[in-house]
Amino acid sequence: MKHAKVAYVPGFHILTGDARSQAATLVIQPGKHVGGPDNTHRGADQWIYVESGSGEATIDGATHPLEKGSLILIQRTQAHGFRNSGQTPLNILTFYVPPAYDESENELPAGQP
């Protein structure tokens, strides 16, 4: 069993994980965006859950609204990015299956836990 406290601080932060999955937070400030057409995870599916704020996700060129309670699955190799179109921080809890990053928050090559 692993336990982590979810704290939303600006940027991307790994919370916890094991060889099969990983949890992280992503906070995007108003008017800012992260990711884009070159942002993919070759070796991991990514689930995002919007805790608060609003914006949009662009996945393989299609735009989807993000609001509190949104849950989206981004499959491995799908290009994606997120934009905060609201007035408050966009707080996202994200899960990778399998892990996509090492402890230093560097992306892992496909197939490496």
What are these regions (language model features)?
Residues 36-37, 57-58, 74, 80-86:
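Short beta-strand His + acidic residue motifs that chelate non-heme Fe in jelly-roll/DSBH
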Residues 3, 83-113:
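Double-stranded beta-helix
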Residues 1-24, 30, 35, 104-113:
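A short, N-terminal "cap"/entry segment at the start of jelly-roll beta-barrel domains
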Residues 62-76:
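Short acidic-glycine-tyrosine-enriched beta hairpin
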Residues 52, 60, 95-97:
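Cofactor-binding loop segments of dinucleotide-utilizing enzymes, especially the Rossmann-like FAD-
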Residues 27-28, 40-57:
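Short, conserved beta-strand element in jelly-roll/cupin
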Residues 43, 62, 78-79, 88:
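A generic "binding-loop/recognition-motif" signal
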